[in-house]
Amino acid sequence: MPGLSVSTVFFKFSSFHVSAQDDDAVAATAAAEANLVKIGILQFAPHASLDNCYEGIIEGLKNTGFIDGISATIEFVNGMGEIETNNLAAASFVSKNYDMIIAIATPSAVAAYAAARDAQIPVVFSAVSDPVSAGLVRSLDFPDTGATGTTDTLNFDGQLKMIRVFLPEAKTIGVLYTTSEANSISQIESLTEAAKDYDFEIKTVGITDASEVAMGAAQLIAEKIDVMNNVTDNNVVNNFSVVTNATDPAGIPIFGSEIEQVARYGCVASESLDYVALGILTGEMAGEILKGEDVMTMPVRVVKDSFPVYNSEIMSKFELQLPADYASATDVAGAR
């Protein structure tokens, strides 16, 4: 046989051998991926505190042995503050038969639970202020619905004390909130009750969507408020520059509900929750459930610890001095 023919036969055999190896590798990879735990993570909107939750969740999952591409397949969707986008993402996770959905913020948690309930896919939520009122669990101690997670309980006593010390002459606190966010309504009820002990009057304006934020802020200013206090309202936080564009020229300072609102968004100070830590706890709970713990009986875990932060640059805009009571608080000016 001529040399050319021998080379050709050898080449064809080698190509067949390599092709078979490639097919085997693809099949092995597909089989391995099929055996990975599939987790969908749904975040309501792109703002800093929820981003911190997501960061913590990934760390918490890792702490319990679930790492994307190694022991789990994790798909992340940001709902961009749109209810319909959140609903579609949750339905997509269910249609793909995911093993779990982790939802960040109340609207995402409600969407995930509505989609996953009949499919009996466990839902673990993070940063949901009142999961009972939102219809996610029967009680904090015994969820009994197929959903559990973490709740961010704001330290209103600490927050009101801070406002009173920073602004001893203040009498009225304004709050802007979204009427469809159950967490905001619950927080305002708690804030209003706590305000009685600090001689504050709470004035609120409810809005329905982002297009009404500017109008709502203007209405609060017209109410002659002395200061604003921001809760964890996703719609308001996601459009916070619209609020400060109205309040800053009016000389009305805003106190935030967590560190990012002080470091990034223009709030003066806050008794802040640590949303990375909240996310870590959420991720670890999710990992425990994936390893066999019962989502029906795992209690909702409440995070209450807060720490004081302030922004010296924002304080200067309002000619405020740091009170002696907060000398040990953390200045987050320029920290982000």
Model regions and ranges:
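Short hydrophobic alpha-helices and adjacent helix-cap/hinge residues
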Residues: M1-R336
